[in-house]
């Protein structure tokens, strides 16, 4: 995969969270969309954090913005866009992480090519590796995801 899609915490900047790691969220209200891989991952990775379930992402982010919860745990890509958007009213910031898990989040994003096109596959693999090594891939990520994924 050329892009892993991690989970992240986002916190309301008005919440008094101690420290800069997820351990500081113990005892705080942390929202998550119920029935999702993020709910299962939160329970598995952070058993000391009691999750507050929400029916959907919109309800979760509204509660976070209105400070009904101190933090949320969800898809890093979606959270990055939300934090950078006017919808967040600059209430919140990404916090700790990223958290990767092939078990919960899958293998990441890949580029699909014809199975028998080994020349094109090798060329794309080489180009992505070169971009990664010289820092250009990170530069491109930050252009489109200014708050980062990782």
Please describe what each predicted stretch is:
Residues 1-150:
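Proline/Glycine/Serine-rich low-complexity intrinsically disordered segments
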């Amino acid at each position: 995969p050329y892009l892993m899609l991690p989970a992240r915490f986002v916190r309301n900047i008005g919440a008094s969270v101690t420290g800069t790691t997820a351990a500081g969220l113990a005892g705080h209200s942390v929202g998550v969309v119920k029935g999702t891989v993020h709910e299962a991952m939160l329970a598995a990775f952070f058993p000391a954090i009691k999750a507050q379930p929400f029916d959907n992402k919109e309800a979760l982010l509204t509660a976070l913005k209105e400070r009904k919860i101190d933090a949320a745990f969800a898809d890093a890509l979606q959270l990055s866009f939300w934090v950078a958007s006017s919808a967040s009213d600059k209430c919140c910031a990404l916090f700790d992480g990223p958290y990767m898990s092939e078990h919960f989040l899958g293998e990441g994003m890949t580029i699909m090519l014809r199975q028998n096109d080994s020349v094109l596959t090798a060329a794309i693999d080489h180009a992505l590796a070169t971009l990664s090594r010289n820092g250009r891939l990170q530069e491109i990520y930050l252009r489109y995801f200014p708050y980062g994924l990782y």
